Amino acid sequence: MYQNILVPLDGSDNAYMALKHAVKLAQTFKSKLFLVNVIDITRLNAYSPAAYGGTLYTNLLKVAKDNSQDILDRGQQMASAAQVESLPIQVNSSPKASIATDIPPKYAIDLIVMGKSGTNAVSRILLGSTTAYVVQKAEVNVTVINTIDDPD
C-alpha cells in the first residue's frame, strides 16, 4: 500500500514515536523510509554574516548540521535495528514547505508520518505549526502521531 514513507525528525520524543510507528508500517508494507531533518535556515539567517560577521553564522550552521546528522543517525539506527531500509535527507530550508510540498514529489512519497508537535515550545502551544501546515498542504496522506506512550 505504501512504498515510500517520509518521517520528519527534529530530535523530539514525538518525532521518534512517529518513527516507531513508521517502522511498523514499513515492516508491514515492505516500504522504504525517508528520514528528513530540516535545518530551519530562516532562523539562522537572523545571525547572518552581514549582521554579525561570518564566524558566528558559520559556527551556528556547523552546530545545526552536526545536530541534524546526529538526529538522522539515531533514526537510521532505529530503522536498521528493525531491518527496515531508510534514506537520510538533510535539508537547509523551511521545514513546513520542505516536508509538505518539496520532498514528497522528489522521492515519490506516498505517506508522511510525523509527530503532533516538535521541539519548538511556541509551536507546541497549538497542534504544532509545522504539523498543521503539512496536514493542510501535503498532497499525500499524513499520519499524525500523538505523544501517548507506546508499550513497545
Q: Where in the sequence are the language-model features?
A:
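Short, well-ordered secondary-structure micro-motifs
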Residues: 18, 45-48, 99-101, 124-126
